[in-house]
Every structure is written in C-alpha cells, then in structure tokens.
A protein has these predicted regions:
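Conserved non-cysteine loop/helix-boundary elements of the Radical SAM core domain that shape
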Residues: 1-66, 80-87
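AMP-binding (ANL) adenylation modules
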Residues: 73-75
Length: 187
C-alpha cells in the first residue's frame, strides 16, 4: 500500500487524495481481516521537513504493516515535481542512484540536506524493524512457521543494505565539512 507520508500537509502537497486517518483505518481493517500489508513510504516529497519525516516514521509504526519499503523522492524530467524542484533550485544533481542500484537523494530543501534524508531512510528501517513487536513477528515466523530459509535470506539482504546505507551516510557527512551547509547544485 502506497501510504507515501504520515504528514497531512505532505499528502496535500502531492495531491494524494487520501488522509492519514483514512490510511490508518485501511491498515486496521486489513489487519483485522488477517490481510498482510506492505507499506510504502517516500522521504523528500515536496515540502518535506525534519518534522514531517518524523511524523511519517511515527505514523508507520502505528500502522504495524508486515513489511515496509522506504524510498527517496526523485524528480523525473517532464513531471510537475521536476519542474517545481528545478524552478526552486532544489535539485542538487541529476544522479538518482549510485551505480549499484541504491537510491541517492538529489532533492535538497532549505534545512533538509540530502545526507539527512539518506540518514533518515536508514533510521526509518531501524526504528520500524527493531521494535519489540516487529522483532517478535520475525522470530515467531522463523520458529513457529519454520520459515527460516526465507527469513535468513531476507535478514542477510536487509543487514547488507543497511551497512551500505550507513556507509553512504558517513561518506556524505565526511564530504561536507559543515553538515548545516547545503550541497552545491550540480555536484
């Protein structure tokens, strides 16, 4: 389910046509019916702030989806988002991935550096999956359902990607002497 954001203003900005309350009710109904929900979230959408990212992480934890995916907003040429980001000078570069298929942030809003967005993707996963309820669910599946082979592969892939994201965040921080200084356009 594409929840995108847990911040009402961000949902309005992207013209989602849904509300936080409606999304929460949908997830609850699915859980009550025993349906598995995979939640998709995007950080760096138009108008994103540190507070709206925090709202989204907190919102995701209340939904208690079986699994989540956290993506980074990308402004593709020919889209309304691209025109908005380009005209406001928010595009720091045209590089949306690192060559290995990993997403890279390329939109920087005032007070929201690209390396912060990357770090928050990393934190989002940590805060979501390392909660007692989420950890218990994984252990329960491994022990009770004997789903060990699949979970082992998924856990190994998750931890590898987590290490890669952590490395990218550290490299981005070290490349910028003052983390409060915005990245230069075209870099």
């Amino acid at each position: 389910m594409g929840f995108e954001s847990g911040d009402p203003q961000i949902l309005k900005n992207i013209k989602k046509g849904a509300t936080v309350e409606r999304a929460r009710a949908f997830a609850k109904d699915c859980n009550d019916l025993g349906l598995v929900v995979h939640g998709d979230f995007i950080l760096g959408l138009p108008g994103e702030t540190k507070e709206s990212i925090r709202n989204t992480i907190n919102f995701a934890k209340t939904l208690d989806c079986e699994t989540i995916q956290v993506s980074i907003a990308h402004a593709y040429p020919g889209t309304e988002f691209y025109d908005y980001a380009k005209s406001n000078g928010f595009i720091t570069n045209e590089r949306m991935e690192d060559g290995g298929g990993h997403q890279m942030a390329h939109i920087e809003y005032p007070g929201l550096p690209v390396d912060y967005v990357m770090e928050m993707v990393h934190r989002f996963y940590d805060e979501y999956y390392f909660r007692p309820k989420a950890a218990f669910r994984v252990i329960w599946k491994a022990v009770i359902n004997r789903d060990v082979p699949r979970l082992y592969v998924e856990a190994k892939a998750f931890l590898k990607l987590r290490a890669q994201r952590n490395k990218m965040v550290k490299e981005a921080r070290s490349a910028r002497p003052d983390p409060t200084t915005p990245a230069k356009a075209g870099v």
